[in-house]
Amino acid sequence: MLIKKFLVAAFLCISSMSSFAAGGSFQSVLTGNFEWKSIDTVDGSVMSGAFQGLGMVVEGDGIFNSGMASRGECLVRVRNHPGGRDINAECTIDYPELDSKMFMLLERKAGDIANAGAKGDGVQTILGGTNKLKGITGTCSYSIKYLDAVTTVSNNNCSYSM
């Protein structure tokens, strides 16, 4: 009977550890600056930019703890056309406390960009990571606001699995 109780306790402990490592959710805030370049095209314009910023997890579970800091770098492409605007960014987020990086694709088709008061909502896809974030996937919703033409603040709500 004692062995049976031990095996049940061990199973529950291992199960809870694997589900803890299997995923979770977190909310983060990221602020930073863009450097933009733009050209006209036959049906609108294309704008590209590089982003660098700093972030912090404000609420999280699993591997992402509240107070965890990050550095972000993105290459952004904005295409203005008669049907609207497509905004895409490929980003690398570095989490020094985890000695790991996370790779993301951001997409947005609504809202404004690159002027004071501009804002919009979009979707981020977590594509993978390195070291402790190897195998991570997931999605995030985000809201971004421009304080001026180059300075932004974004709020990100993510769920992930490993």
Task: Name these PLM-found stretches.
Residues 2-9:
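Sec-dependent signal peptide recognition
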Residues 12:
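Acidic/polar active-site rim loop that often engages polyanionic ligands
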Residues 22-162:
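Beta-strand-enriched cores of mature, soluble protein domains
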Residues 15-19:
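N-terminal signal peptide c-region/cleavage motif recognized by signal peptidases
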